[in-house]
């Protein structure tokens, strides 16, 4: 009996706690758990390092980059990334088709070019002003002043457009250069082909093109507002000078019973007013409509022109009668004054 404890003590593997297989399994389990904990800790450290990248200074980032480039496992890492890239590049190639030009942007470009805003300055505003002058049928001082004002405002719009366009192009070029340099720098660590850099540049340009389209659209709207204000042909046709309006009103009220001038009369009025025959026809058509709608309002104007016509007719009649009658005898000149003698004979 005394030898039994001695035997059990001399053979520690005997019993539940000292069984060799159980002891080995317990040791292996402990090692596996320690390995899992170690791997999780390594992943946690890596994630923590990634999260602190944005907080690093430029010198720290350069030092880590240099350490990565000098690491002995760097080529192996690059090869693994290339293999992954080869597997995924096939799905990307299908989406690299060139998109057609935006038709709206092309229309805006054509309009700005036609108005003389885009492209070299070659008098686009002057051409538009000259066209409006031809449509209005006159090149008086008022028209010249308005056309000069139009050209000045168009030049201002052009200057603003080119200034903003230059800012846009500068910002686009700076951002594109920054992205290209960044991709070239990253290509030392991960595989980036020149085609991918070109694709990224085209994406950037498409993003910036929306800003360019807004600029061109607002400029076109400003030009259209300017044209409607200064070069509207219908407004020009209504704005005859005072002398032309007087001539047309005088003819209208002197022929109020039949205010429909013949073609010969229209041509004569057009020459006097320095406007076109079609403008004369339009003026009389509008005048007849306004007169019929507001007869009472235009009655006073009709009386004024009737009185003026009567005065002119009286002056013409007086001058005509004086020209046709013989001169009145007088002692100062003309016929000699008769002299009565005592014998009552006129000598």
Swiss-Prot record:
GO molecular function: DNA-binding transcription factor activity, RNA polymerase II-specific; sequence-specific DNA binding
Localization per Swiss-Prot or TrEMBL: Nucleus
Region (PBC-B): 127-232
DNA-binding region, residues: 233-295
Domain PBC, chain residue ranges per copy: 38-232
Keyword DNA-binding: yes
Cited Pfam families: Homeobox_KN (PF05920), PBC (PF03792)
Biased composition (Polar residues): 318-331
Location of region: PBC-A: 45-124
GO cellular component: midbody; nucleus; transcription regulator complex
Positions of region (Disordered): 1-37, 318-347
Tissues in which the UniProt entry reports expression: Shows broad, weak expression from blastula through gastrula stages. At stage 14/15, expressed in a broad arc that gives rise to the forebrain and eyes. More intensely expressed in the lateral neural folds (presumptive neural crest) and as horizontal stripes in the posterior neural plate that give rise to the hindbrain. As development proceeds, expression progresses posteriorly along the neural folds and at stage 21, expression is pronounced in the prospective hindbrain and in migratory neural crest cells.
Record-level GO BP terms: animal organ morphogenesis; brain development; cranial skeletal system development; embryonic organ development; eye development; neural crest cell fate specification; neuron development; positive regulation of DNA-templated transcription
Record keywords, A-Z: Activator, Developmental protein, Differentiation, DNA-binding, Homeobox, Neurogenesis, Nucleus, Transcription, Transcription regulation
Keyword Ligase among record annotations: no
Entries under SMART domains matching the protein: HOX (SM00389)
InterPro entries: HD (IPR001356), Homeobox_CS (IPR017970), Homeodomain-like_sf (IPR009057), KN_HD (IPR008422), PBX_PBC_dom (IPR005542), TALE_homeobox (IPR050224)
Domain of life: Eukaryota
Cross-referenced PROSITE patterns: HOMEOBOX_1, HOMEOBOX_2, PBC
Role according to the record: Acts as a transcriptional activator in complex with isoform 2 of meis1, to induce posterior neural and neural crest gene expression, and thereby specify hindbrain and neural crest cell fate. Binds to a highly conserved region in the promoter of the neural crest gene zic3. Required for the nuclear transport or retention of isoform 2 of meis1.
Subunit structure: Forms a heterodimer with isoform 2 of meis1; the interaction is necessary for neural fate induction.
Additional notes on this entry: The displayed sequence corresponds to the ortholog of the mammalian isoform B sequences. There is currently no X.laevis ortholog sequence for isoform A.
Protein family per UniProt: Belongs to the TALE/PBX homeobox family.
Annotated PANTHER family: HOMEOBOX PROTEIN TRANSCRIPTION FACTORS
UniProt-recorded name of the protein: Pre-B-cell leukemia transcription factor 1
Species name: Xenopus laevis
Gene from which the chain derives: pbx1
């Amino acid at each position: 009996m005394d030898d039994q404890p001695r035997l059990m003590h001399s053979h520690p593997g005997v019993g539940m706690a000292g069984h060799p297989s159980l002891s080995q399994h317990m040791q292996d389990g402990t090692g596996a758990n320690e390995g899992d904990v170690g791997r999780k800790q390594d992943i946690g450290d890596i994630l923590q390092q990634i999260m602190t990248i944005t907080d690093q200074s430029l010198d720290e980032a350069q030092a880590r980059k240099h350490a990565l480039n000098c690491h002995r496992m760097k080529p192996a890492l690059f090869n693994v990334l290339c293999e992954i890239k080869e597997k995924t590049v096939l799905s990307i190639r299908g989406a690299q088709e060139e998109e057609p030009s935006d038709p709206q942007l092309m229309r805006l470009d054509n309009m700005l070019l036609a108005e003389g805003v885009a492209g070299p300055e070659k008098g686009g505003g002057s051409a538009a002003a000259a066209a409006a002058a031809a449509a209005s049928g006159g090149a008086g001082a008022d028209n010249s002043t308005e056309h000069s004002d139009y050209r000045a405002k168009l030049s201002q719009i052009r200057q603003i457009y080119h200034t903003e366009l230059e800012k846009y192009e500068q910002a686009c070029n700076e951002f594109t250069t920054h992205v290209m340099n960044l991709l070239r720098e990253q290509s030392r660590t991960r595989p980036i082909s020149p085609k991918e850099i070109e694709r990224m540049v085209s994406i950037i340009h498409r993003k910036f093109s929306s800003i360019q389209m807004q600029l061109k659209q607002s400029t076109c709207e400003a030009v259209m507002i300017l044209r409607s204000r200064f070069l509207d042909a219908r407004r020009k046709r209504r704005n005859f000078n005072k002398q032309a309006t007087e001539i047309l009103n005088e003819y209208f009220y002197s022929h109020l019973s039949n205010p429909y001038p013949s073609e010969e009369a229209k041509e004569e009025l057009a020459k006097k007013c320095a406007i076109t025959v079609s403008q004369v026809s339009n003026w009389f058509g509008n005048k007849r409509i306004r007169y019929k709608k507001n007869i009472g309002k235009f009655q006073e104007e009709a009386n004024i022109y009737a009185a003026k016509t009567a005065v002119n007719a009286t002056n013409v009649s007086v001058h005509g009668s004086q020209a046709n009658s013989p001169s009145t005898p007088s002692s100062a000149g003309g016929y000699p004054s008769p002299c009565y003698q005592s014998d009552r004979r006129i000598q």
